[in-house]
A protein has these predicted regions:
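Short, positively charged and aromatic/hydrophobic N-terminal segments
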Residues: 23, 30, 40-44
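Conserved C-terminal guanine-recognition region of P-loop GTPase G domains, centered on the G4
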Residues: 123-191
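Nucleotide-state-sensitive switch-loop elements of NTP-binding domains
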Residues: 83-146, 172
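P-loop NTP-binding site
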Residues: 232-340
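Conserved G1/Walker A P-loop phosphate-binding module
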Residues: 46-114
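Canonical P-loop GTPase G-domain recognition
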Residues: 170-227
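G-domain G4 guanine-recognition motif of GTPases
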Residues: 107, 140-142, 163-176, 194-202, ...
Length: 340
């Protein structure tokens, strides 16, 4: 019966003005409505161009880069502490939608390097300028300059879109925010400026929407069910290192590297053996603590977080090993994924 096709065509024409979902609902009570809903969905998917691109996050230490990354991804991929240099690697978080894939890259805070490890960390930041489709430059309210003039010059001369995010606005007032926005509009005239609180999730959705607008048309780079490019062992290492950053002072947290030697996953349990690398024998004693109490605390807290992350019971063994001067060794830095 030709009237069946007329029934289908009329709501289909209305699709562009009334929206796929609302229009389809009106016809769900009819057999034609089910056909319409399915066919309209296919048409919608075919006619919506897919977007994908790299969105790289840069800024000074402790301005909220990792907090924003985790807010976007919806998972705790980057560890967060109050100490500078918490992020050492460039960490990719993947946000997927039906018609987009956003590849977010969290980078170490910008510093002047004092040893080879820090030089490698700054190489990660430099690489963020090379492949970005959108650059997120994060400052915190009250901040007035980037700590490295060369990086700042790259931002102000960038040919790609720059979104400058003034973070932690929950810690200030309207006057300080206006002053900060005026300052950064003058310093980075090529940037779009947003006021946000990544921790409180304020203003984040507006930034998210703007990023999607700016993404280039492209097929997805990764499978749509993939969350990151890092392996499970990386997140084990970072979780343990986070606890060390939280509980130890002075040079200890910055002299430590974690290496997961064993990672065996069964149906109900994951068995992990990890080594905590330090540079000196004296640091080894501090990490272990009196009667092993300090390293026991690190193990217990790490295990709890890893059980939340993996959704399974975790059996975690940790021990400490001296790896002298690893932060200035090209070979050791490559081993830990910082070079080459």
């Amino acid at each position: 019966n030709n009237s069946h096709w007329l029934h289908f065509t009329l709501p289909y024409v209305a699709l562009t003005s009334k929206g796929f979902f609302d229009t389809g609902l009106k016809y769900l009570s009819t057999p034609q409505g089910y056909v319409f809903l399915f066919c309209s969905y296919l048409c919608h998917m075919e006619n919506t161009p897919h977007k994908a691109g790299f969105v790289n996050i840069i800024g000074n230490p402790n301005v909220g880069k990792s907090t924003l990354m985790n807010a976007f991804v919806g998972e705790r991929l980057s560890i967060i502490t109050s100490k500078a240099q918490t992020t050492r690697h460039r960490i990719l978080g993947i946000v997927n939608g039906d018609d987009f894939q956003m590849l977010l890259s969290d980078t170490p805070g910008i510093i002047k390097p004092a040893y080879q490890l820090q030089e490698s960390m700054m190489d990660f930041v430099k690489s963020a300028f090379d492949d970005a489709d959108v650059l997120l430059y994060i400052v915190e309210l009250g901040e007035k300059e980037l700590k490295d003039e060369a990086f700042f010059s790259k931002i102000t001369n960038s040919k790609i879109p720059v979104l400058l995010l003034i973070n932690k606005i929950d810690k200030g007032d309207e006057t300080s925010l206006k002053e900060s926005m005026t300052l950064w509009q003058e310093k980075v005239p090529n940037a779009e400026i947003f006021a946000i609180s990544a921790l409180e999730n304020f203003g984040v959705s507006e930034v998210f929407k703007r990023i999607i607008d700016l993404l280039p048309q492209s097929p997805a780079f990764y499978p749509k069910d993939q969350l990151t490019d890092k392996p499970e062992r990386f997140f084990v290492n970072e979780t343990i290192r986070e606890k060390i950053l939280m509980h130890y002072k002075k040079e200890i947290p910055y002299s430590v590297e974690i290496e997961t030697e064993e990672f065996f996953e069964d149906e109900d349990i994951i068995r992990i053996r990890a080594v905590i690398m330090v540079e000196r024998d004296s640091q080894k004693g501090i990490i272990i603590g009196h009667k092993g109490e300090a390293i026991k605390r690190i193990g217990v807290e790490s295990r709890k977080d890893l059980e939340k992350f993996f959704g399974k019971q975790i059996h975690l063994e940790t021990y400490v090993k001296v790896n002298k001067n690893w932060r200035n060794s090209d070979r050791q830095l490559r081993r830990f994924g910082y070079n080459g």
